[in-house]
Amino acid sequence: MDFRTYLKKYPDKNGRFGQYGGAYLTAELIPAFEEIADAYQTICHSSQFINELRRIRKEFQGRPTPVYHCERLSRAIGNCQIYLKREDLNHTGAHKLNHCMGEGLLAKFMGKKRLIAETGAGQHGVALATAAAFFGLECEIHMGEVDIAKQAPNVTRMKILGAKVVPVTHGLKTLKEAVDSAFDSYAKNYKDSIYCIGSALGPHPFPLMVRDFQAVVGYEAKDQFKEMTGFLPDVVTACVGGGSNAAGMFIPFLEEPVDIIGIEPLGRGEKLGDHAASMKYGEKGVMHGFESIMLKDKNGDPAPVYSIASGLDYPSVGPEHAFLRELGRVDYKVINDEEAMEAFFKLSRYEGIIPAIESSHAVAYAMKKAEEMKQGSILVCLSGRGDKDIDYIVEHYGYGEQYFK
């Protein structure tokens, strides 16, 4: 595979990345998603749209976000140098706003009045509520009751921004059920609404759109890292739930001689129901309108999943990630809850940066890899900040003293 031409080839016109992707939809939703795909194909080449998005990123989001050298953390581990792409400094505190502003601008272009979405950790919900406020649109966010309890600050932020938060009370009451609920609402309201999926997954064109809107992360990081150091990193890594921050971070490095590693949540362990490591333990399947690798129960349905990170507990992964692994270009590893928590506290104490639990999985891998590498450099996408997580963490882990004995 020549990755210099990869973006021109994938996805194909049917939204497929090899055997993955596509759009598996009910008859009533096919025209709705075709309308979105057609609108995106028109607007993504428009200089007016591109210029407006650039203006929003600069003036509203505060982009570009910096690349930061973790000198103290690196020194504590050894000679390998760890760098962070600081998406925690993007407006609203995570990478999610990158695609939400793009989706909001698309909705405006299409004449839609409402944005509908699911959220797990609440970051996508906050980002979409922010976009809705910016563009003067209504916003409806579906969120599992378990996540509402865990992520109270983000629920408050969404409501302050004017969003209607719909609690999801069936099943495990987490991210998968929130997606189900949001899909149901969109099916009833698609004529005046747009469904803004929160990751690089779902039916075509969402894996393509979210990747395109998030690629700004990787393009910035690549240029910034080269400017800082004079060379490319040896390893690029990001956490993977659905895979939006990872898709954005990885795409610009595909054609470069760089190891690319996605990090999934191993949670409490290898038993089904104790993790959300789709790539490690999953198999091919269809859910939520797209084909990818998914965790299945004995009946072939989406399996129950768990992660300490609400934004990672999803039983599948974006189709492009499945394809990139199949091509052998990107590798996927796992980090458990305990490793993520150690990274959370160590980054906080050594660098004064409190990361999201999701991002802590990628930081944990970078710390393990740095110890193994002895020298070289690792660039981590720090996908978000940890404000939303601190109450939950302090209640269950205290202030992290156990990691500094």
From Swiss-Prot:
The modification N6-(pyridoxal phosphate)lysine is found at K96. Its cofactor is pyridoxal 5'-phosphate. PROSITE patterns: TRP_SYNTHASE_BETA (PS00168). GO terms for cellular component: cytoplasm. Pathway: Amino-acid biosynthesis; L-tryptophan biosynthesis; L-tryptophan from chorismate: step 5/5. Keywords: Amino-acid biosynthesis, Aromatic amino acid biosynthesis, Lyase, Pyridoxal phosphate, Tryptophan biosynthesis. InterPro entries: Trp_synth_b_CS, Trp_synth_beta, Trp_synth_beta/beta-like, TrpB-like_PALP, TrpB-like_PALP_sf. It is an enzyme of class 4 (lyase). Pfam families: PALP. It catalyses: (1S,2R)-1-C-(indol-3-yl)glycerol 3-phosphate + L-serine = D-glyceraldehyde 3-phosphate + L-tryptophan + H2O. The beta subunit is responsible for the synthesis of L-tryptophan from indole and L-serine. Belongs to the TrpB family. NCBIfam families: trpB. This is Tryptophan synthase beta chain. It comes from Clostridium botulinum (strain Eklund 17B / Type B).
